[in-house]
C-alpha cells in the first residue's frame, strides 16, 4: 500500500517536522512509540537526537496544534507534527526513591555460560535488588522466553518484586510493564540492568527514553556475549541521553546523606567493592 492511502488497517496521516510535511500512513491503533519511529524514518537525518521532542496533534476544534493527549492512539485521518522543546533539556540524573523504579532484564540461567562476567553482574544485580527492598523501590523483572531459557537465576532474590513477566520481544517496554508503570504515576527515573547490553537492554532503554523517562544504565551489572557489542551499545546509549553509571553510585545517590535512616543498611551492601571483573578494561 502506498503512503497517503488507507485500507481497512491503515489510516492516512500528515507528518510535519520543521518546514517539511509528508503524507504517510500508520496502522489503526498506533500509539506514541509507533509515531516516534515513523517520524524518525521520515526525518531521521534532520532530527537532532540530543534534543528533547514532543508530538502535537492538529485540533479542528481549536484550529491549532495541541500536545498529544495521554494515551492517544490513531483511529482516523489526522495531522501531527514533531517539535523540539523550546530549550535543550540538561539531564541532571538526580535520583530519589519516591520517583524511581528498577528494571531487571533477563538474568536467566541459560545465559550463564555465554555472557561475559555473568557471575559478576549477577552479584551486582543482587546488590541492587537488596537496595531496592531496603529503600522501598519497586522492581520490575523480565524473563526472555523462560520456557526455553529458564527463570531468573537463584542467586537473585526477587522477593517483593512488583512484577515478574515473560516476554519474547527484546524490549521490556511491553503492556505488562507499562501497566505496572501506570500504577506508579510519580515515577520518572528507571534504573536498568541485565542482559544483553546491546539487545534487550539497549532496546528497553531507548523505548523508555522515548516515553519521557530518565534512564540510568548500570554499567557494572550488564554484559553481552561480545565485549565489543557491549562497548558500542553503552557508547550509543550515552550519546542518546541515557545515563551510564555504576551500582554504588546509584545506591548512594538514592540515600543522598549519611543521616538517611537507611544509610547504614545501604553501607553494609557496598562495604565490599563490586567485583573488578574486567568489564571496563577488556574488550
Curated annotation (Swiss-Prot):
InterPro entries, alphabetized: Isochorismatase-like_dom (IPR000868), Isochorismatase-like_sf (IPR036380), Isochorismatase_domain (IPR050993)
Family, per entry: Belongs to the isochorismatase family.
Pfam families: Isochorismatase
Organism: Salmo salar (Atlantic salmon)
Name of this protein: Isochorismatase domain-containing protein 1
Recorded superkingdom: Eukaryota
Amino acid at each position: 500500500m502506498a503512503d497517503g492511502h488507507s485500507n481497512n488497517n491503515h489510516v492516512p496521516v500528515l507528518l510535519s517536522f520543521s518546514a517539511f510535511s509528508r503524507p504517510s500512513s500508520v496502522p489503526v491503533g498506533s500509539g506514541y512509540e509507533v509515531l516516534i519511529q515513523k517520524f524518525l524514518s521520515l526525518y531521521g537525518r534532520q532530527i537532532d537526537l540530543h534534543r528533547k521532542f514532543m508530538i502535537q496533534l492538529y485540533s479542528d476544534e481549536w484550529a491549532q496544534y495541541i500536545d498529544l493527549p495521554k494515551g492517544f492512539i490513531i483511529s482516523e485521518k489526522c495531522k501531527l507534527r514533531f517539535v523540539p522543546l523550546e530549550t535543550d533539556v540538561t539531564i541532571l540524573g538526580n535520583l530519589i526513591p519516591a520517583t524511581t523504579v528498577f528494571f531487571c532484564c533477563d538474568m536467566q540461567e541459560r545465559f550463564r555460560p555465554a555472557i561475559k562476567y555473568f557471575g559478576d553482574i549477577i552479584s551486582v544485580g543482587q546488590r541492587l535488588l537488596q537496595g531496592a527492598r531496603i529503600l522501598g523501590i519497586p522492581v520490575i523483572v523480565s524473563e526472555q522466553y523462560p520456557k526455553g531459557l529458564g527463570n531468573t537465576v537463584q542467586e537473585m532474590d526477587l522477593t517483593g518484586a512488583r512484577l515478574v513477566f515473560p516476554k519474547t520481544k527484546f524490549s521490556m517496554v511491553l503492556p505488562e510493564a507499562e501497566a505496572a508503570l501506570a500504577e506508579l504515576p510519580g515515577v520518572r527515573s528507571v534504573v536498568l540492568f541485565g542482559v544483553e547490553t546491546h539487545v534487550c537492554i539497549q532496546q528497553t532503554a531507548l523505548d523508555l527514553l522515548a516515553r519521557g523517562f530518565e534512564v540510568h544504565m548500570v554499567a557494572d551489572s550488564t554484559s553481552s556475549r561480545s565485549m565489543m557489542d557491549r562497548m558500542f551499545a553503552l557508547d550509543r546509549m550515552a550519546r542518546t541521553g541515557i545515563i551510564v553509571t555504576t551500582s554504588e553510585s546509584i545506591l548512594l545517590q538514592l540515600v543522598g546523606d549519611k543521616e538517611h535512616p537507611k544509610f547504614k543498611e545501604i553501607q553494609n551492601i557496598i562495604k565490599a567493592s563490586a567485583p573488578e571483573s574486567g568489564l571496563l578494561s577488556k574488550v
